[in-house]
Amino acid sequence: MTALAGLLAFSQAARIRAQQAGDSGSLELVDPDVFRACGDPRNMPFSNEKGEGFENKLAELLAAKLGKKLSYAYFPQATGFVRMTLGFFRCDVIMGFPQGDDQAQLTIPYYRTTYALIVKQGSGLEDVATIADPRLKDKRIGVVARTPPSTVMAMNGLLAHAKSYPLFVDTRADSSAQAMLDDLASGEIDCGILWGPMAGYYAARANPPLVMVPLVKETAAAPMTFRIGMAVRPSDQEWKRTLNRLIKENQAEINKLLISYNIPILDESNAPITAETLSKEP
């Protein structure tokens, strides 16, 4: 069966199910038996083809809660990712997507995180809280181009000594995060600023481990903290409600999963959510 024929057959079956259910007009092409997630094939700590990322594990958890089988469609998370995955019906949910991005419809957020500074132990930068800290003036800082930290660095006159890494790469061949960590280890840069999940994951696995400082005290105009949910097609309203329910019912377990990957997660007052704070909850 060709891919097109398969899609048409799936579409026809969905139409029949919708009619049998007394559907009022909106058509949802969500597989009733398979939790069809999509992600990047090589983008740890989020996902990889071996199923080792926290988004992979979250998909496993939610599939089990629904009693569904799990399947994954992989595509490099660069330009065209949403269109090539959700848009072409290769999957029914993108497991991690920032609020405010209008390419797809979002669920409620299941975590909140921020950009973070990563430094070596003994660097004298371990307690830097903002990009405006005078100690960064003469430092060579690694930063991913066209991200909020690069905007704040420009506002503070820090780009002259910065080393820039590309925002969009084919993750099957390159990793800006790993390149930054390698440069920090070799002394090519003095510190780096990464998206929080990457900063936490890679800092914990470095040898020796690096210090991660979430930039929660940053007061510049560019937003540094974001809520992350899941993305579905705009037509899939009932599916979105199902995912919202699952997130609410399993938030504590989701938090534990994120913490196990050293992801810096924050509550709405920017206080860190840690294993210790979770243990104190009733």
Question: Can you say where each PLM-predicted feature lies in the sequence?
Answer:
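Alpha-to-beta junction loops
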Residues: 68-69, 86-96, 139-140, 179-180, ...
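Extracytoplasmic small-molecule ligand-binding "clamshell" domains
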Residues: 20-102, 171-174, 260-261
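Periplasmic-binding protein-like
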Residues: 40-41, 112-124, 204-247, 263-282
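Acidic, polar ligand-binding/catalytic clefts
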Residues: 60, 64, 69-135, 146, ...
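N-terminal export leaders
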Residues: 1-3
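Extended ligand-binding regions for polar small-molecule ligands
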Residues: 28, 53-66, 122-125, 129-148, ...
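Ligand-binding cleft/hinge of the Venus flytrap
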Residues: 59-69, 73, 130, 135, ...
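Ligand-binding clefts/hinges and TM-proximal coupling segments of bilobed small-molecule sensing domains
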Residues: 8, 20, 148-169, 244-282
